[in-house]
């Protein structure tokens, strides 16, 4: 999981620092403080690695929307540093220790990726001015608080710099012998050092628009888990009107960020064809992991939490239009009917989309304002289910969530809260420093965290 970000020059994020804890990280604060900008950065990072700086910038609305505005101009450079730590699948990692590969020891990968993006009006594009990627193996998970102490003695340290003549230079500062496997065309020799040979290899492929992690991911299957950690998470802001739009039967399964794709996902689950069987699919589709495949029975049990009248769900392909028709069997007392998806309530469709996304996506990175359209009772149920689904199997994972709902906050823990404010045009995130006292007070009084947040009882760090 990504454990911390340091950002300067991205929208309202200036001299911005945020440490992420495993589990839920709930962003709260008034409108306009930059909560969505925080989530947008992670989406930007995902496209930056999966594609290139110009496309990532265009995806978020162009340079004018991404680079920080200063008076009547904008800051021409974005700098960022991202740290993370994730467990390795030792069976797939050739350069893991023999003890780890035999299952006797758990291995974790610690990484730091720092970069500077420059918008050049001369070339009308966004390019990397500088990048540095550092990576090492450890025998335990390292949090953001421990990083300054543990972020030393790297196994791999690569830096790429854009010179004044617009040519790229590469420097491999460190390359442990076992990491030679990262470079498939690496040929050892006595005439030069391993670091120099690695530099020659990287020079063939590094450009001003190539992210170092993207390069390593594509040339080394052993680094695919790095892609899952930095790119794989999905961001959701479900819009019921988008869920109701008819979908073609050829559309691939998977819930999109706006909720579209529900029909195709349910159709694939009905046909038991959700998981991709090609073992090389993840390798050639950087960062896009195969979807999980729960049973429809499991999904229906979750659907009934919001609407007990739902007895069954069916998906059929209209042979004339090739549109997918989703119908829900509704039973309420003596009343029985087959209701099409387009006639279901907005709240029910949002609940169904959120739960289907959580159960099928390889990872869920952020959810914006899940309380919209949901009954107050279901808001608390949603938090409980998110913990149950997202973190039961992935202990070292985190999910961001934005909310304005006191009801939803009443089901959250003080340690999960991040209070966001705007100071001098800059987004500032803080965690409450009186977590223990607040937890004791909640236990004694019976009031929830939302009550104390509204009352202003949270102390900032």
Where are these regions (language model features)?
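Short acidic, glycine-rich loop/turn motifs
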Residues: 9, 82-90, 103-104, 135-137, ...
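Electropositive, glycine-dotted interaction segments
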Residues: 99-289, 293-297
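Conserved P-loop NTP-binding catalytic core
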Residues: 40-127
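Short, acidic Gly/Pro/Ser/Thr-rich loop/turn segments
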Residues: 87-89, 241-245, 427
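Switch/communication elements of ASCE P-loop NTPase nucleotide-binding domains
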Residues: 1-51, 295, 302, 309-461
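Short beta-strand micro-motifs in enzyme catalytic cores
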Residues: 78, 234, 322-326
